[in-house]
Amino acid sequence: MRQLAFFFFFLAASTLCARARVHEMEFDQARQVALIVARFDNITVDDRTIVMNSMDTRTEAGFIPGYYSFSIIRESDSPARPDETIRMYVVSKKTADTWELNLCTHYSFPELQKFQQDLMHKTGANAADDPDMPKAIGCANQAQMKPAAE
């Protein structure tokens, strides 16, 4: 009888822990977030002249551990001119919170907020699950907000 009680206790405890655990979003979801932010910045990623690349390819942990990172590049059509990095977006794997890495700009606008809420509902996260993001990406002191366009 004790063994049966212990089994049910263990099963209930592991189920509660599994529900409490926050899952991370998938790479493709983070890429979608970065594309939403790029459109907000009036950047059209067309995969010909303006491309989006992952910056997370060098190590398994990624460019910045805990975050997906994407660069948007205008590719040169001439060997005499270099490619131009237009933006570098960093997306939290937990909350889909998004920053531009070089400008230290935090994004918040209705379309992005809705997408973030939908993702957090799926992953079990909430907006407070990644409070150290500005510090982790090196933007703690110079952060600025990019609100929705009026």
Language model features with spans:
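Contiguous hydrophobic segments
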Residues: 28, 32, 36, 74-77, ...
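Exposed beta-strand-loop-beta-strand "reactive/processing" segments of non-cytosolic proteins
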Residues: 47-97
